[in-house]
Amino acid sequence: MTVVILLGASGAGKTTIAETIASRHADTVEVFHFDRIGVPTLAEMIADYGSPEAWQRAKTFDWIFRLSAAARRGRHILFEGQTRFSSVSEAALAAGLLDHVAILVDCDDETRCGRLSIDRKQPELADRHMMDWARFLRTEATSGGHEILDTSAQSVDASARHVCRHFA
């Protein structure tokens, strides 16, 4: 079965898209969210893994191995989270997860700031670090030839339909 991985910075719409697909296609698509494992404090990440990047990479490997096992059960898999495309690629190779597609869910900075500050009431996330992270992921997706789904002016329904075409 197909494994679709939605990556992106906060506010891009990946969780909203995943939740929409989960509610409409629960019989055929199993949805997983990276953050549901719990995100430790920065101090805990450093103490346990050496850096936030190392924590993220280790958890990406854990997730990809879990997704690989879930895909063998015969259902389509949708996973969303914030991690590097390079970590997903390395983990997929190690897990033998060859049939997957990684998509960047993205939006412009103005839309991201509005979603984080107004819609989610988390203005502290709409900072330069998040915009830099979004730019990093955009560059990584482009250089790796990954699909980019720009949700800036696209409805949630249209975005969900776009992702679901990978399950057809």
Which ranges hold each PLM region?
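ATP-binding Walker
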Residues: 12
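P-loop (Walker A) phosphate-binding loop of NTP-binding proteins
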Residues: 9
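Small-molecule kinase domains that catalyze NTP-dependent phosphoryl transfer to phosphate-bearing small molecules
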Residues: 121-162
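Hydrophobic anchor at the beta1->P-loop junction of P-loop NTPases
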Residues: 6
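Walker A/P-loop
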Residues: 15
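Glycine-rich phosphate-binding loop used to anchor ATP phosphates in small-molecule kinases
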Residues: 55-97
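Conserved phosphate-donor/acceptor-positioning beta-strand/loop module used by diverse small-molecule
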Residues: 96-117
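Conserved substrate/cofactor phosphate-moiety recognition/catalytic segment
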Residues: 19-65
